[in-house]
Swiss-Prot record:
It comes from the Bacteria. The keyword Cytoplasm applies. The gene is rbfA. GO terms for molecular function: ribosomal small subunit binding. It is found in: Cytoplasm. Belongs to the RbfA family. GO terms for cellular component: cytosol. One of its GO terms (biological process) is maturation of SSU-rRNA. Coiled coil: none annotated. One of several proteins that assist in the late maturation steps of the functional core of the 30S ribosomal subunit. Associates with free 30S ribosomal subunits (but not with 30S subunits that are part of 70S ribosomes or polysomes). Required for efficient processing of 16S rRNA. May interact with the 5'-terminal helix region of 16S rRNA. It comes from Caldanaerobacter subterraneus subsp. tengcongensis (strain DSM 15242 / JCM 11007 / NBRC 100824 / MB4) (Thermoanaerobacter tengcongensis). This is Ribosome-binding factor A. Monomer. Binds 30S ribosomal subunits, but not 50S ribosomal subunits or 70S ribosomes.
């Protein structure tokens, strides 16, 4: 059981490194113009699927276009992963938007505003 978790975690880290490198240096899709950050990768127990959570910085239009570009590049990314990482099955790449960073920034702004208001009251 623990061996599978270790293997899954190790594969997630390797995938994160390789996919980040591909997005930065190799994918030439003009839709991918916003800054993309891979926040997490979840690999299923059978190692057949990898959910790649991405945070995209930019306007709403840039986010939408960039996400569409990433989804269309999933096949290329899977092919390249198969060439670069030796494993029995190459996982299918599924991109998911991660809003946690935006959510955290909003909470931080709210807390700053509350602290500012509290300071004004004193």
């Amino acid at each position: 059981m623990r061996k599978m978790q270790y293997r899954s975690h190790r594969l997630s880290e390797e995938l994160k490194k390789e996919i980040s490198k591909m997005i930065l240096e190799e994918i030439k899709d003009p839709r991918i113009k916003a800054m993309v950050s891979i926040t997490d990768i979840e690999v299923t127990k059978d190692l057949r699927y990898a959910k790649v959570y991405v945070s995209i910085y930019g306007s709403e239009e840039e986010k939408r276009e960039t996400f569409e570009g990433l989804k269309s590049a999933a096949g290329y990314i899977r092919h390249e992963i198969g060439r670069r990482i030796k494993m029995r099955y190459t996982p299918e790449i599924i991109f998911e938007l991660d809003h946690s960073i935006e959510y955290g920034a909003k909470i931080s702004e709210i807390l700053k505003e509350l602290n500012k208001q509290e300071g004004d009251d004193n």
